[in-house]
Curated annotation (Swiss-Prot):
It comes from Listeria monocytogenes serotype 4b (strain F2365). GO terms for biological process: glycine decarboxylation via glycine cleavage system. Pfam families: GCV_T, GCV_T_C. The gene is gcvT. The glycine cleavage system catalyzes the degradation of glycine. This is Aminomethyltransferase. The glycine cleavage system is composed of four proteins: P, T, L and H.
């Protein structure tokens, strides 16, 4: 059996009562105090996530921008230095290699932050499709990454840094920012639907920053609450809402797919065809009317006919209802449409509802 990978924060998990699981080959905390309490901490105050398992890929060179324009669906030329952009990497078929965030450090240097389980696959795909004068380097092992999320995130982080955090706009970032005596990159971003920051630092210093933030009275948060938070906010998870068989258009990520950008990109032709022909299926929100929790890969029925599958589901700690995302036949995606979810050989009533399930007050 292959030994599980560990983040630089791993030695501290036991001290804070973490219960760990195998997550894509990594030994990561599923919870600390408990999923519901952790979820509520992030929605009402703040919580700290160890996301050091995420991958970082450095792209450098005079042709970096044109290379990324070819590789990614969003318009890279629109990113200013010091800003980040959500992006999708597609196959020729229009299916998804990964979803990721691109940070623009300079006109010739970018960092791509990718899903942990996809890091090697993404890196190989990027190298295989290299064009122009660029270098592509997997620098994942050099970085620790923490996410401080919640309405109190700015107030808490302000105690540990001299950076004027209020000047960092959403998806903006600052380099060489001192946090608890460590040089970091602070990005105003996250995966929870709340305000917050993602902080990148050298791996060796990650534990120091982690403990300095927790010392401010912040709760450590595990993967369980990370999933319920992102699901309420309807943020896609690769392997569930996106995959090699699911295009970003089917997943409702049109805002990150710029079919009109001049640059050709991998998958552009297939995505244009799909859009012109009309989508056969699309991602919708569902809420269960009867008791039961929808889970990944559960079938969705209408009048005995299978019309789709659940991609993600949970009991929503914020709403107190059982919710899910489902990829279903476009003909049946109207709000209010009643469907059934197959749960343990029973068909449980559900209805299609507007998304996101949760949106924070600005």
């Amino acid at each position: 059996m292959t030994e599980l990978l560990k983040t630089p924060i791993h030695p501290l998990y036991a001290k804070y009562g973490a219960k760990t699981i195998d997550f894509g080959g990594w030994d990561l905390p599923v919870q600390f105090a408990g999923i519901k309490a952790e979820h509520e901490a992030v929605r009402t105050d703040a919580g700290l996530f160890d996301v050091s398992h995420m991958g970082e890929i450095l792209v450098k060179g005079p042709d970096s921008t044109s290379y990324l324009q070819y590789l990614l669906t969003n318009d890279i030329e629109k990113i200013k230095i010091g800003k980040a952009q959500y992006n999708i990497m597609c196959y020729e078929t229009g299916g998804t290699v990964d979803d990721l965030v691109v940070y623009k450090k300079s006109e010739t240097e970018y960092i791509l932050v990718v899903n942990a389980a996809n890091t090697d696959k993404d890196f190989e795909w990027m190298v295989k499709n290299i064009r122009g004068d660029v270098s592509v380097t997997n620098v994942s092992s050099e970085y620790g990454q923490l996410a401080l999320q919640g309405p109190s995130a700015e107030k808490i982080l302000a105690k540990l840094t001299d950076v004027d955090l209020s000047s960092i706009s959403f998806f903006g970032f600052v380099e060489d920012a001192d946090v608890a005596g460590v040089k970091t990159i602070i990005s105003r971003s996250g995966y929870t639907g709340e305000d917050g920051f993602e902080i990148y630092m050298p791996s060796a210093d990650a534990g120091k920053v982690f403990e300095a933030i927790l010392a401010e009275g912040v709760a450590p948060i595990g993967l369980g609450a990370r999933d319920t938070l992102r699901l309420e906010a309807v943020l896609a998870l690769y392997g569930q809402e996106l995959s090699k068989d699911i295009t970003p258009l089917e997943a409702g990520l049109n805002f990150a797919v710029k079919l009109k950008k001049e640059a050709d990109f991998i998958g552009k032709e297939a995505l244009i065809k799909q859009k012109e022909a009309g989508l056969n299926r699309k991602l919708v929100g569902i809420e269960l009317i009867e008791r039961g929790i929808p889970r990944h890969d559960y079938p969705v029925f209408l009048n005995e006919e299978e019309i789709g599958i659940v991609t993600s589901g949970t009991q929503s700690p914020t709403l107190g209802t059982n919710i899910g995302l489902a990829l279903i036949d476009t003909a049946y995606t109207e709000i209010g449409q009643e469907v059934e979810v197959g749960i343990r050989n029973k068909k449980i009533k559900a209805k299609i509802v507007p998304t996101p399930f949760y949106k924070r007050a600005k």
